[in-house]
Every structure is written in C-alpha cells, then in structure tokens.
Amino acid sequence: MVLNMESTGEAVRSTTGNDGGITVVRSDAPSDFHVAQRSESSNQSPTSVTPPPPQPSSHHTAPPPLQISTVTTTTTTAAMEGISGGLMKKKRGRPRKYGPDGTVVALSPKPISSAPAPSHLPPPSSHVIDFSASEKRSKVKPTNSFNRTKYHHQVENLGEWAPCSVGGNFTPHIITVNTGEDVTMKIISFSQQGPRSICVLSANGVISSVTLRQPDSSGGTLTYEGRFEILSLSGSFMPNDSGGTRSRTGGMSVSLASPDGRVVGGGLAGLLVAASPVQVVVGSFLAGTDHQDQKPKKNKHDFMLSSPTAAIPISSAADHRTIHSVSSLPVNNNTWQTSLASDPRNKHTDINVNVT
C-alpha cells in the first residue's frame, strides 16, 4: 500500500514481507519509488493520458490534474462560442459582393418565398448570405395583365378612323319579302327610313324573275324567268346629300342556282321577284362622316390672363361651381370683372350652415 502525503511530499509504502516493516520514502528518493497519482473523478474515459509525475519543488505541492484542466477549457470555449453566436447583431445594408480574402461571395440558392431560416447557426467558415429576411419582396405583376386604359384609348382612336370596325353602332335586321314582291324595292324602302347606312349580308328563298346587268361595257341587261334558288345576296346603300336632296347610292349582286344545276349571277339591274317568302338579313350602321358629325366636339381651351382670387369659405361652396364655370370662358381680361358684376346669375347668396 502506498500513501501520498501532499503536505509533506513523502510517500509511505507498506510491504507484507516477513518482517512486516514499513519503509518511508522521501521526496528526494530515486524515481523508482514514485507512483503516479490517481484521479478522483470516476467517469474518466479509457483513452485519457496519465499525466507525468510531479516534479520536486520547494513547497512540495502537487500540480492540478492535466485532464480536468483540458476538459474545463474545451467546455468554456464552446460555451463562449454559443453565447457570441446567439448575441451577434445582424448587419444591415447592402451585403458585400467580395469576402475578406477577395473571393466572390456565393449567394444563397433559396428563393425569396422560402421558409424561415433554421434555428442552428451555419459554421463560421461558410460565406453564405441569406436575403430572405433582409430584403423586401417586390410586387409581382401577373403575366396576363395589361394596361386597360391604354387599350381602351386605342379602341376609341380606331373607332374615329373606322367606326364600323368597333361594332358598337352596328344593328342587324331581318326583312321578310312576301311572294310576288320585289326584293330590291323592299330593301331600298327600308334603307330610306333613317339616316343610317345599310349593308345586305345574306338571303334565302326562291326567285321567279331576275334582271341582271351584262358584264360587258354595252350596258345591256338580261332577264331570267323560272325558279331559282338564292345562293348569295350582298350589297350596300349609303346616304348621300347633294344640293339639299337626300338620296341613296349603292347596289346589290346576286347568285342564283337553276333546277338543272346551272348558276347565274351578277349585278342587279331591275326586278328581283320572290317566288316564295324570302328572308333578307341586313345591318344598319353609321358611316364614318355621320359618326364624326354626331360626336360632341371638344371645346378648345384658350389661354387667358386672370387675377388671383381669394379663398372661398365653406359656406359658399355652392357658388364656387358657378364662378369656376364662368371664369373658364375665353372672355377678355378687361371686361371680366364687369361681366361678373352685371350678370344676375353670379350673385352670391349667403348660406349659413351649422357644423356640429
């Protein structure tokens, strides 16, 4: 048995020999008598290194265990790193493009709409910057959206140039022609009922007699009699004002099929008698000139000089609209004050309003 006395620096060895004596070894004895100290901690790892034997000193005090000091230092360092990482203040402003060593900083591949960052901190050596929490999300415009105001303005301009393309003033009509009546005269009489222009779209029925214009330049006509099925009927009649007399200009063309399969057609030059009830589809619209005449003309604003006016109180808010409409008229600056004073419509009326 060996006893280590720290106060005196002496080691006592008990031997169980024949004499049963006790040998006392002092600190200045040879190294064969020294024994390594035992650690008091019971949970040491089996791979721990045994510290070297204590060196003799003047005070004969043993140094603290080396293993315990190492474990304490490692634990303290880890704790300090955790505290410094948790209390690190997040920097604001634009992130750096280059790192301290001059290398380009890699951006985070995460999108802006990703989930919040995890609770654990990245390793100190990584240079990954996350913009999900620092930058604001910008408004994303849908791909199928467009400027409706600009589109509406373009349509209005197109209507001024070609009103028929917009289709807002186009009205369809159906004309029924009884047996024995002239289809041409029926359409012309319908077009004379108003100032609108007429276009013939289609027709169906049977014709008993038709007069067509010859295609040559002689100006002759051809008349066909029998039963002919209407294949197509088209034309237009436009209003015309010449010398104060309102008239119609235009014409129609027709294609007919005979019972034996022959097809005849051309420009109508006379009667188109119906052999059965005939339905004609026409459309009425305003021509380009009529459309521009009926549009309200915009008043051109002339520049005028006017003296500054005083502020108008709330009690005379009703009179403010009258003064504003009169002041916007292009009148002379010299007679502006006189016209306002002489006009009885511009008299101010005192209105008392109790505001609670």
Curated annotation (Swiss-Prot):
Residue runs in coiled coils? none
| Pfam families reported for this sequence | PCC
Q: Does the keyword Transcription regulation apply?
A: yes
Q: Where is this region: Disordered?
A: 1-127
GO molecular function terms here? Answer: DNA binding; minor groove of adenine-thymine-rich DNA binding; sequence-specific DNA binding
The UniProt entry, under InterPro entries, shows: AHL, PPC_dom
Where the record places motif Bipartite nuclear localization signal is 89-97
Q: Which GO terms describe its cellular component?
A: chromosomal region; cytoplasm; mitochondrion; nucleolus; nucleoplasm; nucleus
| Nucleus recorded as keyword | yes
Protein name per Swiss-Prot or TrEMBL: AT-hook motif nuclear-localized protein 1
Protein source organism = Arabidopsis thaliana
